């Protein structure tokens, strides 16, 4: 068992959370790492055992236009402060992973500055893709070049160049030696060179035990990236889409089909599960019925994978993209505004309870997933391990529903594990002749522990 197999991640976008300037003016945000450490402690309090923080390193604007891979963004603080942050997380038992933006760099990156200054004679011209000295761009460089997503702000690196590969490998060694990080989330992994990622995996196996590589992949066969030769995991965007649209459309078949399909492709690989992140709108802005936030939180924690929370989502905050800007998805928040949320906010309460259950019940991590009942509006499945079972029951309909299914293990009673959460509703269960009946209120979900 590796640490990431039973991890619960808390995702922090630090430039947003700390209220940093959107364009890098070189000025530190007072108390940034003190604030980040307080949020990491909060994450531990609700059961998160790992912190994914990023982008973190010196950039010109949003963090993904890297200027210096080995210098913490001056808007946040210093290398020493980040080193202390990691040490404090480790003291709490939390692992720390950072963003690795290896596909592209910002225009102020040293090698691109050399290309601008020296053109055909540039020492580093082969570090970049599709350089054309007969072309031009909106910056009037007098040449054109490959980029990410059509944005010339993000200059594409040539990952097949051994010098570029070794530069990135040395950067990772620096991050481990200097900061003692535990893994990397690879930005834009779906356009990274596969041989480069194989090299990353070999390096990961050498530099630190259980060093974790997780890639940002949107579409496709995830097993092409997540496999024993390349990455340990990838972002499960396919399930992310199903989580909100399956509830909006009252269609649990979409979620169940997605999980079956991914199990067929990826087998026991644990994909990174999320309901929202720094690139997509928050659940309250996507769901037609916000009561379904509870359902989605339960699914993220109980389906096969690695659950995560994006900062602020445990409070049910909103976040909607504006034209040309993702900053509304990455807000500055103050913990003091939510100091009693676990006792008053239904969303916070259920996330905190799920964190405790994940730590207490091994079947939620290691148990086989057994589908028990599936309709468009009702879904029941179990996590079964060594004769123990938790049963997840969900109703996305506007009317109460009765579920009935075969017991996955022998049992005589069932305990509602989320009965004490804020906003919990009473449910009725009955067991007879190896079958179980559950009466669920409308738009409600919970987890039942089967008892002998």
Predicted regions and their residues:
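C-terminal beta-strand-rich structural cap/linker in extracellular carbohydrate-active enzymes
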Residues: 430-452
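Active-site groove signature of glycoside hydrolases
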Residues: 104, 168-194, 273, 277
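Substrate-binding/active-site clefts of carbohydrate-active enzymes
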Residues: 1-9, 13-49, 56-178, 200-206, ...
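Hydrophobic faces of well-ordered beta-strands that scaffold small-molecule active sites
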Residues: 8-11, 51-53, 96-98, 184, ...
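A structural motif
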Residues: 48, 180-181, 305-306
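Active-site-proximal helices and loops of the catalytic beta/alpha 8
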Residues: 90-92, 116, 177, 187-267, ...
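Loop/helix patches that line or flank the sugar-binding groove of alpha-linked glycan CAZymes
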Residues: 2-6, 24, 28, 255-412, ...
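Solvent-exposed beta-strand/loop surfaces of large extracellular or lumenal domains
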Residues: 415-435
């Amino acid at each position: 068992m590796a640490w990431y197999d039973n991890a619960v991640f808390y995702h922090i976008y630090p430039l947003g959370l700390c209220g940093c300037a959107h364009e890098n003016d070189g000025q530190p945000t007072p108390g940034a790492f003190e604030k980040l450490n307080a949020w990491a402690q909060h994450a531990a309090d609700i059961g998160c055992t790992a912190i994914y923080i990023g982008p973190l390193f010196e950039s010109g604007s949003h963090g993904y236009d890297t200027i210096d891979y080995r210098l913490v963004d001056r808007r946040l603080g210093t290398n020493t402060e980040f080193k202390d942050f990691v040490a404090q997380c480790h003291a709490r038992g939390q692992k720390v992973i950072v963003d690795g933006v290896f596909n592209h760099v910002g225009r102020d990156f040293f090698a691109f500055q050399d290309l601008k200054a020296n053109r055909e004679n540039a020492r580093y011209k082969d570090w970049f893709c599709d350089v054309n000295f007969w072309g031009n761009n909106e910056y009037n460089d007098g040449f054109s070049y490959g980029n990410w997503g059509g944005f010339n702000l993000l200059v594409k690196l040539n990952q097949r160049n051994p010098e570029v590969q070794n530069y990135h490998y040395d950067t990772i060694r620096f991050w481990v030696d200097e900061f003692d990080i535990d893994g990397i989330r690879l930005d834009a992994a779906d356009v990274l060179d596969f041989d480069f990622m194989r090299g990353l995996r070999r390096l990961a196996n050498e530099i630190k035990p259980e060093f974790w590589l997780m890639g940002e992949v949107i579409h496709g066969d995830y097993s092409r990236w997540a496999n024993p030769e390349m990455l340990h995991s990838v972002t499960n965007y396919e399930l992310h889409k199903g989580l909100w649209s399956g509830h909006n459309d009252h269609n649990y078949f979409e979620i169940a089909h997605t999980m079956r399909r991914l199990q067929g492709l990826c087998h026991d690989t644990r994909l990174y599960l999320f309901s929202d992140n720094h690139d997509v709108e928050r659940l309250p802005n996507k769901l037609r019925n916000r009561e379904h936030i509870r359902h989605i939180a339960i699914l993220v924690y109980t389906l096969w994978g690695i659950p995560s929370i994006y900062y602020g989502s445990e409070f049910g905050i909103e976040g909607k993209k504006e034209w040309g800007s993702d900053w509304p998805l990455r807000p500055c928040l103050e913990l003091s505004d939510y100091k009693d949320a676990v006792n008053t906010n239904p969303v916070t309460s259920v996330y905190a309870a799920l964190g405790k259950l994940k730590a207490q019940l091994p079947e939620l991590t290691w148990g086989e997933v057994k589908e028990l009942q599936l309709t468009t509006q009702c879904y029941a499945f179990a996590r079964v391990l060594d004769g123990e079972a938790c049963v997840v029951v969900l109703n996305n309909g506007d009317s109460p529903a009765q579920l009935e299914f075969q017991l996955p293990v022998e049992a005589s009673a069932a305990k509602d594990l989320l009965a004490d959460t804020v906003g919990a509703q009473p449910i009725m269960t009955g067991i007879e002749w190896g079958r179980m009946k559950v009466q669920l209120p409308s738009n409600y979900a919970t987890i039942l522990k089967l008892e002998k």
